């Protein structure tokens, strides 16, 4: 497309942005500014979804200053349009450059199409109205952003996302224990912030090894297309922008990239709304010497309004490091470590009070006295009397307990910035059952190990241990490439026997190396014909998806999935409960990550862990250290990496020497230290914080409401009908799944987000959770949103003519059905949609101009109508013109009255909600310094802004249906 600075264009997919102006044309990209909504968009010049706005003679063109002219001549000069015509108020001859056009101009004129004979099919009018209703329903949902992600409805995860995701610029530390889903919580918050417009530009900083995992998680679970940035991508992006970070809205990068000063400076200047930092417990800090990584994140946190830090159990690197992370979130609040420690001493009393309230026993006098002190500004007598009464209603007692508990939570020192759930406080985890299978060391391995010791004497301790743990690699190294260790390794024999004995079980097998995984698949296939598939880092995302889907299939699927260490990162297989660790990693965190593929929230069965090992080898010694020293197979071990760091030298030495006495001493010392650390961590548990983090009964109510929406059959019917109308090919693939493909007969040339080779979808959350290759369709899914946008941003269904066969009415009786959209242009970040989203207003007029909409239900009326062909419809319209013209003016009067009611209702709702939240936070600020001044200021500014936007609410005629009564 030919673009020039100053030209006016509209977005085909986001018409609500108003009239845009080309502000930059660089390389392959064009940037368009939309002043009405204060938005910028960058498009590819080759296929930008934009339409040039050019008025014709006879049209009215409005200036941004408010005056308008009737166009008599259109002049093009230097690729820009100049309109000449008569000023509508003064009658003078005037000119208007296109750059000075009103930014809020709307362009749909259904009545022009109706009188021009451009009449749509009857069902298209219905689908358009339905689409507008669906968009309105989603925009007004109090759970917007929570239903769409392909995640289980886990109460504590949904609660944290609900609480944090609706804040302006949240600054929060997510510190759940392993397996509780911190990444999912972060993804839910990101998804909610994006859908609600609170954030648009997001930077995710993760370790190098987790970049791919985050990319996959965000795409597969949240339908968010992040871009991974490394040095090569930054260099490539220079063709489009001086700052590479401006070329994408959603970016994942590593800390390593930001260690380069130039890249850090560019990231600091990139106007992010939200930053997410994974593995934040690795940010080392001391008051005198903060690490380079810490200083990088600190610099970014000073520029970026919203910050999410994801960390393991907060105190596992020491309490000072925990304070340092809180300091990143709010340096004014957490300014001094000693002051923080002093403040924390007060939390113990609050926690014991909370424990008592959370229970069912009557409160002791000591607890009541504590409550009166802790909630000194409130009169709690009535609440405590209800709790203590022996004849009080149980629900009333629970409500009184909950109210007092909420008051305590609001006053808790870190309750708004720190969320931490532990397995002790969250139900739903399976039991781990550990099984060990000793095997004799094959003679071939003994010989290979002896030769290896002579040949590789130069290796350091870590290298020797690696060899000792993988004798099959040494054997393969010294034998010919055709030699196959799996033909004599007793662990393989045991594996085959196990799979044959458990043919009905899905079995996940994990090995350290991709080569080992491939060899095992070959062994199972060639020796016994066992159906297995592999999953390793050398495969593409699509190949891994297919392997995972083959494993997940209940009928005809693979019995076993064999994963390498890296290949299994970020993938969970809760539908399986049998885990075989063919070898063991030399890292407790990796062991926990392996077990965590199955042992997660949502696992319905006990998890059986099977470890075949070679007797009297490093494999057995390492297995004993994990089992007897850390109890790592049967329990999670948050202190695992601390213990490994403390004992690594003695452990590595004993793995090589195989000295039994030394091993026993290492095991004994590890057990003692493990018990010490476990005790310290248990004492450090903050019960009040856990209550706040998992949400209790409020979280359960939220999840139940989401589950009810999953069962909405009306939505399923509406979406399938939408795809039918658009022309998407739909094929039932069984198991509650549908394959969608573009067809040659689609209403639109492209359907963004629908792949050429199709996509498999389901409306069943459980099905989607068990199959990585199946998308979960909800009202929030991009395929649904895009479908709604395709219909509502086009002229589809804006005009229709129908016949009503009803002999109780005179033949030829006319009804005019008008659908208006009440709307106001505002930046998405203003949150106006919460109070006045685009709202369909229906008017149904008889020939005398009476509005029958309140008395005649749309659905029942629609069912009585019959379609007519376009030729006859056009004749009927022409014959009715004299009656129709005055009815349009009458319809606008009724719609305007409805707009006034909508606006005032929206204003009242906004004032009540925001004033209530402001008063609550102002009251809390007196007792909890964690309430940030920025949040209060934002609420005040938001109320002023929203009142202004509501004053600018307008009506737009969206669709017309002419109905004539016939007796034929």
From Swiss-Prot:
Q: Which residues form the Helicase C-terminal domain?
A: 491-645
Note whether Transcription occurs among the keywords. Answer: yes
Any GO molecular function: hydrolase activity, acting on acid anhydrides
The alphabetized UniProt keywords are:
Activator, ATP-binding, DNA-binding, Helicase, Hydrolase, Nucleotide-binding, Transcription, Transcription regulation
EC number annotated for this UniProt entry: 3.6.4.-
An annotated GO BP: regulation of DNA-templated transcription
Motif range for DEAH box? Answer: 278-281
Query: Is Nucleotide-binding included in the keywords of this UniProt record?
Result: yes
Domain Helicase ATP-binding as annotated: residue spans: 163-332
Q: Which Pfam families match?
A: Helicase_C, RapA_C, SNF2-rel_dom, Tudor_1_RapA, Tudor_RapA
User: PROSITE patterns, from UniProt?
Assistant: HELICASE_ATP_BIND_1, HELICASE_CTER
Annotated InterPro entries: Helicase_ATP-bd, Helicase_C-like, Helicase_RapA, P-loop_NTPase, RapA_C, SNF2-like_sf, SNF2/RAD54-like_C, SNF2_N
- Where do the annotations place ATP binding? 176-183
NCBIfam families listed in its UniProt record: PRK04914.1
Q: Which family does it belong to?
A: Belongs to the SNF2/RAD54 helicase family. RapA subfamily.
Oligomeric and partner information: Interacts with the RNAP. Has a higher affinity for the core RNAP than for the holoenzyme. Its ATPase activity is stimulated by binding to RNAP.
Summarize the protein's role.
Transcription regulator that activates transcription by stimulating RNA polymerase (RNAP) recycling in case of stress conditions such as supercoiled DNA or high salt concentrations. Probably acts by releasing the RNAP, when it is trapped or immobilized on tightly supercoiled DNA. Does not activate transcription on linear DNA. Probably not involved in DNA repair.
Please name the PANTHER family in this protein's record.
DNA ANNEALING HELICASE AND ENDONUCLEASE ZRANB3 FAMILY MEMBER, SWI_SNF-RELATED MATRIX-ASSOCIATED ACTIN-DEPENDENT REGULATOR OF CHROMATIN SUBFAMILY A-LIKE PROTEIN 1
The record's HAMAP family line, in alphabetical order, gives:
Helicase_RapA
Protein name from the UniProt record:
RNA polymerase-associated protein RapA
């Amino acid at each position: 497309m030919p673009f020039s600075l100053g030209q006016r264009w509209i977005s085909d997919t986001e018409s609500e942005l108003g009239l845009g102006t080309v502000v930059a044309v660089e390389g392959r990209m064009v940037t368009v500014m939309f002043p009405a909504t204060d938005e910028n968009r960058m498009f590819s010049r080759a296929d930008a979804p934009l339409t040039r706005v050019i008025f014709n003679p006879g049209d009215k063109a409005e200036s941004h200053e408010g005056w308008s002219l009737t166009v008599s001549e259109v002049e093009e000069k230097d690729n820009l349009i100049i309109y000449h015509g008569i000023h509508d108020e003064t009658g003078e001859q005037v000119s208007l450059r296109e750059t000075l056009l009103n930014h809020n101009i709307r362009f749909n004129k259904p009545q022009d199409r109706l009188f021009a004979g451009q009449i749509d099919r009857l069902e298209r009018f219905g689908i358009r109205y339905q689409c507008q209703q669906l968009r309105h329903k989603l925009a007004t949902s109090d759970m917007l952003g929570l239903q769409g992600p392909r995640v289980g409805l886990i109460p504590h995860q949904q609660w944290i996302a609900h609480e944090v995701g609706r804040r302006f610029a949240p600054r929060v530390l997510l510190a759940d224990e392993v397996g509780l889903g911190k990444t999912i919580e972060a993804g839910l918050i990101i998804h909610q912030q994006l859908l609600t417009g609170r954030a648009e530009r997001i930077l995710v900083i993760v370790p190098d090894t987790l970049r791919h995992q985050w990319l996959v998680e965000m795409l597969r679970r949240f339908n968010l297309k992040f871009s991974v940035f490394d040095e090569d991508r930054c260099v490539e992006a220079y063709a489009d922008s001086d700052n590479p970070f401006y070329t994408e809205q959603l970016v994942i990068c590593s800390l390593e990239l930001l260690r380069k000063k130039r890249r850090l400076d560019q990231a600091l200047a990139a106007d992010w709304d939200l930053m997410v930092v994974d593995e934040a417990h690795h940010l080392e800090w001391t008051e005198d010497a903060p690490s380079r990584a810490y200083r990088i994140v600190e610099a970014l946190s000073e520029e970026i309004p919203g910050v999410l830090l994801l960390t393991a159990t907060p105190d596992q690197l020491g309490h000072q490091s925990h304070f340092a992370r809180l300091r990143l979130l709010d340096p004014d609040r957490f300014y001094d470590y000693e002051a923080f420690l002093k403040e924390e001493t007060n939390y113990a009393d609050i926690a014991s009070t909370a424990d008592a309230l959370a229970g069912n026993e009557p409160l002791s006098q000591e607890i009541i006295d504590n409550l009166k002190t802790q909630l000194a500004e409130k009169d709690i007598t009535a609440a405590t009397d209800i709790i203590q009464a022996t004849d009080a209603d149980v629900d009333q007692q629970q409500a009184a307990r909950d109210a007092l508990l909420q008051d305590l939570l609001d006053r808790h020192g870190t309750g708004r910035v720190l969320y931490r759930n532990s397995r002790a406080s969250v139900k739903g985890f399976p039991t781990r059952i550990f099984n060990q299978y000793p095997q004799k060391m094959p003679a071939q391995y003994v010989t290979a190990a002896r030769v290896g010791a002579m040949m590789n004497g130069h290796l350091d301790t870590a290298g020797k241990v690696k060899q000792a743990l993988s004798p099959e690699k040494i054997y393969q190294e010294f034998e010919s490439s055709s030699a196959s260790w799996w033909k004599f390794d007793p662990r393989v024999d045991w594996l085959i026997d196990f799979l044959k004995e458990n043919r009905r079980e899905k079995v996940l097998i994990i090995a350290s190396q991709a080569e080992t995984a491939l060899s095992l698949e070959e062994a199972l296939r060639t020796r016994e014909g066992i159906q297995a598939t592999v999953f390793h880092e050398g495969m593409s995302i699509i190949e891994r998806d297919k392997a995972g889907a083959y494993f997940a299939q209940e009928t005809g699927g693979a019995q076993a999935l064999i994963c390498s260490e890296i290949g299994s990162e970020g993938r969970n297989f809760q539908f399986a409960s049998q885990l075989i660790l063919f070898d063991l990693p030399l890292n407790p965190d990796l062991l926990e990550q392996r077990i965590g593929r199955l042992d997660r929230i949502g696992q319905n069965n006990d998890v059986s862990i099977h470890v075949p090992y070679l007797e009297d080898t490093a494999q057995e010694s390492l297995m004993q250290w994990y089992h007897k020293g850390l109890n790592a197979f049967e329990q999670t071990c948050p202190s695992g990496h601390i213990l490994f760091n403390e004992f690594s030298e003695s452990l590595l030495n004993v793995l090589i020497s195989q000295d039994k006495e030394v091993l026993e001493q290492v095991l004994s010392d590890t057990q003692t230290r493990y018990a010490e650390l476990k005790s310290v961590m248990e004492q450090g548990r903050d019960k009040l914080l856990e209550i706040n983090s998992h949400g209790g009964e409020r979280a359960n109510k939220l999840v139940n409401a989401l589950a009810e929406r999953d069962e909405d059959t009306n939505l399923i019917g509406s979406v399938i009908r939408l795809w039918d109308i658009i022309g998407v090919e739909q094929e039932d693939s069984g198991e509650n799944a549908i394959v969608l493909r573009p067809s040659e007969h689609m209403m639109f040339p492209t359907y963004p987000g629908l792949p050429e080779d199709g996509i498999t979808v389901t409306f069943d959350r459980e099905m989607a959770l068990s199959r990585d290759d199946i998308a979960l369709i909800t009202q929030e899914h991009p395929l649904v949103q895009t479908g709604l946008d395709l219909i509502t941003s086009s002229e589809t269904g804006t005009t229709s003519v129908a016949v009503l066969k009803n002999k109780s009415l005179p033949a030829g009786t006319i009804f005019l059905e008008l659908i208006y959209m009440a709307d106001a242009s505002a930046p998405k970040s203003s949150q106006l949609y919460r109070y006045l989203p685009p709202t369909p207003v229906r008017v149904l007029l008889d020939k005398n101009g009476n509005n029958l909409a309140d008395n005649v239900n749309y659905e029942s009326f629609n069912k009585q109508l019959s379609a007519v062909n376009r030729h006859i419809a056009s004749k009927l319209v022409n014959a009715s013109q004299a009656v129709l013209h005055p009815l349009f003016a009458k319809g606008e009067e009724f719609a305007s009255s409805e707009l006034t009611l909508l606006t005032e209702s929206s204003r009242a709702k906004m004032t009540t909600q925001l004033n209530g939240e402001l008063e609550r936070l102002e009251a809390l600020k007196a007792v909890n310094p964690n309430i940030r001044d920025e949040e209060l200021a934002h609420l005040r500014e938001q109320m002023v802004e929203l009142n202004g936007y509501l004053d600018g609410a307008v009506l737009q005629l969206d669709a017309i249906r002419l109905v004539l009564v016939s007796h034929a």
